[in-house]
Amino acid sequence: FDELVEIETTQRESLKHMSLYKILRNNIIFLFNYRFFFRDILEIINLVPNAKSVFKDVNKLNEKFSIEYINISIKNGYMKKEAFDGQYKIFAKNNWAIVSSSLTTWEVLDDSKNKYRKIFDEIMGHFYPFLTKKGVDRYNKKKNEISKKIDEDFKNL
C-alpha cells in the first residue's frame, strides 16, 4: 500500500511536466502491473478483506491518470469537451477493462510482439470519436511515431 501512495505522490507532481505520451505510457504500465488486481478482485477480497481499500486506491490512481490526460487534451484543443457531465469520468473508471481484456486476449493468442501497440490502438479507438479536427490531425501525424515509442518503451516488460 505504501508503494501506491509513493507512486501517486510522484505521479501527481510529475504529471504537471509530462507529455501526453508519457502520461499514457505510465498509465499503461500502471494498469499492466496491477491488472491481476482488477481481474481477480472478488477472489482476492474473499481471501484478504482489506484488499478492497487497496482496490479503491488503485482505481482512483488510474482515474487520475486518465482524467489528467483528458484534461490536458481538452486544454490543448485535441479533444472535445464532454457532451454531458461525467462522460469522461465513466471512461476513466473503466479503461482498465480495455487493457486487461486486451492483454489477456493477446497473451492467450501468444501475440506478445504487438500487444502494447494494440492496447494503444484500442484505447485511441475509444478516444477517437471525441477528438477534435486538431486532435485527429495530431493523432494521424503521430500514430506511427507513438507506435515505435511504445515498442521501444515496453520491450522489457
Q: What are these model-derived regions, one by one?
A:
Residues 1, 23, 27, 34, ...:
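Hydrophobic/aromatic residues within well-ordered alpha-helical segments
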Residues 7-37:
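Hydrophobic alpha-helical connector segments
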Residues 7-12, 38-45, 77, 102-110:
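Secondary-structure edge/capping motif, primarily at the C-terminal ends of alpha-helices
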Residues 32-33, 37-41, 46, 54-61:
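Internal, conserved structured core segments that host functional sites
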Residues 104, 108-157:
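C-terminal peripheral helix-coil segments that are non-catalytic and often amphipathic
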